[in-house]
Amino acid sequence: MSFGHDRSRRQGRRPPFRAPKKRILIVCEGENTERQYLEGFAKYHRDTLVDVKVADEHGVPMTVVRDAKRLKKEAANAARREGDRNLKFDAVWCVFDRDDHPHVPEALTMAANNNMEVALSNPCFELWLLLHLKASPGMLHRHAALSMLKKLVADYDKSVNHTDYHAGYEQAVKRAKRLDELAKVANEPG
């Protein structure tokens, strides 16, 4: 007769394996609109760990990319130091507007050279929000995009509740791809 637990039975049981969640860093230029939308998007899609940071200097694409590069490197160093590869980011995204920034091509190149993705809003993030609600008539100036958004969202003032836009996400993606194709024909960044 054996008292206690059956050792062979205990060794055969393993705790269920759960793959670590993907860790994504998003660095954006906007203090309110972009950050609020992206944080809401991250909460809605709970399958990843998304860390949204606002660039140190708002509104400058090169600063967004430099901050993302620095944060990516800090996470990689922490992962190496702690011996925990899950501290590294699986993906790094830089989110900025085209607006009238003169150094967008350099920012795109720096991001690509550092294995970072870019979500470029051309001309501005408000166009992305607008695409959730209706099709764009084509290439717009940022002031026109903002004006159209304010007509559709009466209380819009550089502040976003993601749930107001979630239902239109799939349509926004399709509409953005169409605009991207038009931009390529016009030889503009998408």
What does each model-identified segment do?
Residues 29-31:
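Helix N-cap/beta->alpha junction signal
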Residues 54-82:
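A broadly used, surface-exposed interaction patch
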